[in-house]
Amino acid sequence: MRLPVMRVGLSLAVALASSAACASLGNVGSNFGLMPNDVATAQALSMFSNQPSAVYYNPAYLARDRKGALSAAFLFTEQELTAKGWKTPDEIVVDDVVEGDSNYNILLGFKTDLSKMLKDDRAIVLGFMLGAERTGLSLLSFNSAASQTAQSLKYGQQSLFLSLGAGLNIVPGFDVGASTRITLAADAKLSADAQVSGQTSFEGLQVAAKPSIQPVLSGNLNWGDLLCPNDKYCWAKGLETAATWRYESDYSANVDANALVPNLISNLPLLISTIDSYQPETFSAGIQYNLYKLRLGASADYQLWSDLNDRFKGDTVKNQALLKFKDVVIPRAGFEYRLNNVFSVLGGVSYEQSPLESTESLDVNYVDNDKIVMGLGFSYLIEKALFLSQPVRMDVSYQYHLLQDRDFLLTTTRNAAAGDC
């Protein structure tokens, strides 16, 4: 009999960098991890997770476990971001910028078995993930701005995260999956008659928002089931490999405003087009070996950040910065050790090279660093939890980002600070 499992998670993440945070081109799934196990292993084992977060990292793996699950997680991030003037001695700190903002996300996920829809006994499992910043208070937050001071490329607000997909077993040992990352594209039109004093009349405002759907495709191979399904001593038992492709995604906004000042200006247009929370097209590959008590895994992401060079040419907020990006490879390694039937320890590490080649970006002043991400977590399974009829799994994890020093030149065409984000 297959039993659904309810999971409750708590994640903690700490970041150390060299700038103040404001806008963000990252998302919670790529910066930290969706569920506590993803955070603990620095996403090294995320492609082989039986939790609902697989819908984003590797939807094919949903078919590996037919048990339904309902998951909830609380992700708290504390960023300590500092910058120091060039050639400033350590004992004389001038114009030191310290940003200690904290943030939190609520993440909900579920998966359910739909195998009864098929005539044969073939697994098909549906998964869903939802992430909202500050319990929904910043559900559709958007921030894209010029700045006279440094602003972090990846750290900052995390927009709404939404992903839906399914995994399907083709033959024993081979699964495929598809899912979608859903973002938002907003368009606004504004018109008004304005007076020199600032008063307006005959205002008109139209706002339209539509979802933008980006695909995720993946495949998973269990070599033991493929090569030697009936031999429990086969060398391939416990060996799995996976591959995933995720298309680029972002949140976008287009504003078309027009003002009329009678007897002075007949047409004053204002056109703004910008993107936020950009994630590049990504190819991922992973391998896992599952022993009696130990699970070892490694993965690598190839991220095509160079595509952002052309995207920013049409961004009216950032096009003057002439930002340059490069493609990067992110290696990860992680483990899970099962101490007994109910308690496990997880850990992982990754090295993330910065895709930002530019060390100077006029009026935008993006900064980013190479970093080492380290995670550690614990998992506890409660077979009989109070009034619940199903097992409950509790996960706690901690992640630390160690950012390497890097020099940037901050440039601006403004004479005085005004309206920085």
Predicted regions span which residues?
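Outer-membrane beta-barrel porins/channels
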Residues: S24-V39, N105-C421
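N-terminal, post-signal peptide beta-strand-biased segments of exported outer-membrane/organellar beta-barrel
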Residues: A20-R122, E360, V367-D370
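Gram-negative bacterial Sec-dependent N-terminal signal peptides
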Residues: R2-A23
